[in-house]
Design a protein with these regions (language model features):
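Long, charged, helix-rich clamp/arm modules that form nucleic acid-engaging surfaces
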Residues: 4-12, 16, 23, 31, ...
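Flexible hinge/switch segments at interdomain interfaces of large molecular machines
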Residues: 2-5, 23, 65-67, 102-108, ...
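C-terminal engagement/docking regions of AAA+ P-loop ATPases
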Residues: 3-4, 9, 396-415
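Broad gene-expression machinery/nucleic-acid interaction feature
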Residues: 124, 175, 241-245, 257-259, ...
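Long hydrophobic segments that form regular secondary structure
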Residues: 249-293
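Catalytic phosphate-handling regions of large nucleic-acid enzymes and associated NTPases
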Residues: 2-238, 303-305
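Hydrophobic side chains in well-ordered alpha-helices
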Residues: 192, 274-277, 317-318
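Residue-level signature of catalytic and energy-coupling elements of molecular machines
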Residues: 27, 50, 95, 179, ...
Length: 415
């Protein structure tokens, strides 16, 4: 039996209204606090907190490595209270050169592989910041961005990084929120910077004009892109579908037989899954003419060898592999990011404009900070100048007077 002592505090609510409000608050929390990147620095909160925790641990590129368990523990304990097991996979991805076009973390140890092998436990792996991450956090101590309290109000964390380079455009992002998702392609940093320079010189340029500077996605795993229509679509609208192909060449053996050598595969494709799919198509006779599939990948890079039977045309076999396996696959672009805390779909001009506006704000705040410091320093230097101009009189006064009287005289002289 439940005893209710204060019935005036009981509020009658419709369950539909409560569920609607609770679900909306939950979905917005996932969207803003977890799944979608900020258009300014291209990072999700978990990524930003990991990098900031490493910054506080002084894990600069020239310094030593630290255990990932220490980094994950500090991140979880100070900024991201969801446990080290949630933090570690995010840390690992920022160190994988097949996941990010420009990695933000320099990992030491087993950080997984393109075959889908898991990384070693965090107690065995070590990490430090890459130069790219340092550039993202450059001028953080010059009042360039706002800070806010962490989850338990014991310290502060940056709401965004100053971001010297357009991380969202060059590294892309992916995430699934409640009722929406994002899937943004990485690009070549030189091409992106050329596009930004063109925009600064001509802010009236349209999104389609960026095609003169940005050829298309620059996936870290290499490969080819088939056609330009998908690129044009997402440059103009923020949505598009890009067809990717792995890089393959036909080599001839001394005995006259041919083999297909794959050296690059589409982005986000697991190499082991590709091999299994090729074997499956051979067993089901969808692709005929393959006698052997070998993975000869090593330190020199990827090398997947498919031996073609005699009397079969290697080029025909390769075209069937494009058709029936993931050697040809698509990347669906959905440029959704947070703009002032609100999720928006952005075309290329929108993303560049937001980045340029943000950098303008950062540089303005940094300049004001440095000006204030210089003005404070100016007051001290002015005192030095007056002292040097009257050095003989000052020395005479100090020697002839007690300390309090000398201090009073010097203060009047400076005023």
């Amino acid at each position: 039996k439940i005893m209710i002592h204060d019935r005036s505090r009981i509020e009658l609510l419709e369950i539909e209204d409560v569920l609607k409000k609770a679900y909306l608050e939950y979905s917005m929390s996932v969207i803003v606090s977890r799944a979608l990147p900020d258009v300014r620095d291209g990072l999700k909160p978990s990524q930003r907190r990991i990098l900031y925790a490493m910054h506080q641990l002084n894990l600069a590129p020239g310094k030593g490595f630290r255990k990932c368990a220490k980094i994950a523990g500090d991140t979880s304990g100070n900024f991201h209270p969801h446990g080290e097991q949630v933090v570690y996979p995010t840390l690992v991805r920022m160190a994988q050169d097949w996941s990010l076009r420009y990695t933000l973390i320099n990992g030491q140890g087993n950080f997984g592989s393109q075959d889908g092998d898991p990384p070693a436990a965090m107690r065995y792996t070590e990490a430090r910041l890459q130069k790219t991450a340092v550039d993202l956090m450059s001028d953080l101590d010059k009042n360039t961005v706002d800070f806010h309290p962490n989850y338990d109000d014991t310290r502060e964390e940056p709401s965004v990084f100053p971001s010297k380079f357009p991380n969202l455009l060059v590294n892309g992002s992916s995430g699934i929120a409640v009722g929406m998702a994002t899937n943004m392609a990485p690009h070549n940093i030189t091409e992106v910077c050329n596009g930004i320079i063109a925009y600064i010189e001509n802010p009236e340029m349209e999104s389609v004009d960026f095609l003169k500077y940005i050829s298309g996605p620059d996936f870290p795993t290499g490969g080819f892109i088939i056609g330009k229509s998908g690129i044009k679509d997402y440059i103009e609208t923020g949505h598009g579908r890009v067809i990717m192909r792995g890089r393959a060449a036909i080599e001839r053996k001394d005995n006259g037989s041919e083999m297909i050598v794959i050296t690059e595969i589409p982005y986000m494709l697991n190499k082991t899954n590709l091999i299994n799919k090729i074997v499956e198509t051979v067993k089901t006779r969808r692709i005929e003419g393959i006698s052997d599939v070998r993975d000869e990948s090593g330190r020199q890079g990827m090398r997947l060898v498919i031996t073609v039977k005699r009397n079969y045309d290697a080029d025909t076999v390769l075209q069937k592999m494009y058709k029936y396996t993931q050697l040809q696959s698509s990347f669906s672009v959905n440029n959704r990011a947070l703009v002032k805390g609100i999720p928006q779909v952005l075309n290329m001009k929108d993303m560049v404009q937001n980045f340029v506006d943000f950098r303008h704000e950062v540089v303005t705040r940094r300049t004001k900070f440095e000006l204030d410091k210089a003005e404070q320093r100016l007051h001290i230097l002015e005192g030095y100048r007056i002292a040097l101009d009257n050095i003989d009189e000052i020395i005479k006064t100090i020697r002839a007077s007690d300390p309090d009287a000398a201090l009073y005289y010097l203060a009047r002289m400076i005023d």
